[in-house]
Amino acid sequence: MKDGFLKAAALSPALRVADCTYNTAQIIQQLREAAGRGVKLAVFPEFCLTGYTCGDLFLQRTLQQGALTGLQAILDASRELDVVALVGLPLLARGKLYNCAAVLCRGQLLGLVPKTYLPNYGEFYEKRQFTPGSTEVETITVCGQQVPFGTSLLFRCREMPSFVLGVEICEDLWSALPPSTFHALAGATVIANLSASDETVGKAEYRRALVENQSARLLCGYLYASAGHGESTQDMVFAGHDLIAENGTLLAEAAPFAGGRAETELDCQRLEAERARNTSFEPSADGYVTVEFSLTPADAVLTRWVDPTPFVPGDPKRRAERCELILKMQADGLAKRLEHAHAKTAVIGISGGLDSCLALLVAVRAMKQLGRPTTDVLAVTMPCFGTTKRTRSNAEILCDELHVSFTEIDIANTVHSHFADIGQDESVLDVTFENGQARVRTLELMDTANRTGGLVVGTGDLSELALGWATYNGDHMSMYGVNAGVPKTLVRHLVRYEADIAATADLKNVLLDILDTPVSPELLPAKDGEIAQKTEDLVGPYELHDFYLYYVLRFGFGPAKIFRLAKAAFAGRAEYPDEVLYKWLRNFYWRFFAQQFKRSCLPDGPKIGSVTLSPRGDWRMPSDAAAALWLAELEQLFPHEG
């Protein structure tokens, strides 16, 4: 349960209809095996003690008592197990029969939750035997214990307060207003559904969508354990379709007829973070009773997949669709700004690198959207000391293929003059030497925009903004930053997508060569005609920084948890041992705090994804905040590296 991870399982053991002794033994066996795997939450199907298909046998006292005897045996077996378990059984209470979920832990019966919505249509006729549950919670005696009984029950783990369990049963989820909605608003971060959903054509897809959508709507983890092999096939077939979803994402699934076990880790901290930032999620716990329980804290081995590129969809079709959407968003944002400013030109500094390439592609799309000629895009290349033949050539070819206006301004003489003015020794290749060139380029672009009645389009991306890898009032400044919401890992895929759909072979080839060019500001003199300054050698791999950026901003995770996630995401990558992951994570935090002053005065630019750094929107942070707490937490991971 360290870092908010809860190992959970939805289990569908084989059973025999009305054979409580056999079913109990199956449940105990699977419960013990699950506990041995480190599972802390185990959910079994609806009526797993008796079988769902007992029909009018549910009204027989012998079956009812057999279920209670089985429940007592499970309680006894659970005393030695460090797991919360949920099992389904018929329960006679208040003179009526209820379809119940029993919640138990270490021999204690924590609560009994009756089903709210009883289906009485098609193949279902539960109202023939059962009574709907009430929201009112009362205490009844079951298995010699005083137990809360009612639908308005929550179960909270003392050792991990972010793990709060709510319960509903099968049809409850399929109703117009599921009880889980109220459970979540009352504080439940995890919903367990004990189900006996029969299999019909197309139902598995619908069921999966229900679980995914409910977990997204409630910002929760959702476990769905459905009855499987052994149920009566007199009129129906049950397939043991088990599902575990988290905030709209399916984490684990036992497909129909595939064995009946879905198991993964839920991230309760992540769910809490989502709710904390969502002001539309308004808590309401009126009428709810919360029962507390204890589990031994454990460091679960992560089996859930951690995406090493969270900004980039892995599926090629989805990635292409995402790229097209993002390019349209960027182009639309720029088109609106060009219209509003009555700009005659869109002025872009072109280096032959990725970011300026993407900005140019976006500007061309914007002009086409406005019905204007692409020659209204004015690309300016400004070679100086670090410019290489490769990047210069690529810039010219790209502009020619896109049919934009092109001009070259050699800034070397201006930079020499500027250095003479301020007394800069040009043999000293320091930050002044580098930044002086960047600021001269911005001066040229701004004045060119004034001369042509245009607007300077910024090229800097989200990753550079996070790291502060931009010259203050140099490339940091523009009149509209189209890439401000796009991280570097995504920039590469946007350019690659444009290469894939390029109208000509020459355009495709130049885009591919730009993709193959090392990322560089080209501010230091070239060595033998080659780039002498590679960004990722200086600030670290962008795929790592984008990973860190995502989890820092999207969920507010601490350094230790992010380090753990990085180890899982980049496992097997020889170039990323723990020491390297740590080094660049520490570098990320140091730069992120130190460079906030640059982000506090960002030009306008469109929000693209859920992570952005606009000081007018998603990220408001004082420029003089201290990073000490975060760096101290990192120091605990590698004291020798501090």
Please annotate each region the language model reported.
Residues 1-347, 365-374, 401, 406:
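Enzyme catalytic cores with a strong preference for nitrogen-chemistry domains
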Residues 6-7, 161-163, 220, 232, ...:
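ATP/NTP-dependent adenylation/nucleotidyl-transfer catalytic domains that generate, transfer
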